Amino acid sequence: MIHSSNYENQKKLGIPFFAVPNTLKHFVDPGHGWYRVSREMLFRMDLLDKISSFSYQKGNWVYLEEDVDASIFFTRYKELFGELQIRVTTNISENMSSIRYYQPFQMGMGSGCL
């Protein structure tokens, strides 16, 4: 069911209904975890200036650290789109994740800058 206020939020943000993420990848290593979200989606959700350098970036993807930055994302998602109806697929590594070697997040960096 599409709530009209949520639909209006999507229109204001320029996010087509089909572009709202409904599946996220969650990467976990023995010490931490990250959710992968496109930089464009963070931009459209007005979150780029709220993400810390504890998250990482590579190309058009931002890997939100699971403690604070991912919570900010999920709270905003619920504000804009209503109930959280996101499927999460988890990739668990027994070793240190390669994400730790990506560039720390910076708002003006990355190939997805808008």
Where are the regions that the model predicts?
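Compositionally biased, intrinsically disordered low-complexity regions
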Residues: P16, G33-Y35, G110-L114
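A short, structured beta-strand/loop element
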Residues: G31-K58
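Compositionally biased regions
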Residues: S5-N6, S38, S98, G112
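Eukaryotic non-globular interaction segments with acidic/serine-rich, low-complexity composition
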Residues: M1-D29
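Short, flexible coil/linker segments at or flanking structured domains
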Residues: T23-K25, S52, W61, T90
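Short, compact, well-ordered microdomains
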Residues: Y63-L114
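Intrinsically disordered, low-complexity segments enriched in small/polar residues
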Residues: S5, K12, K25, G31, G33, W61, Q106-G110, ...
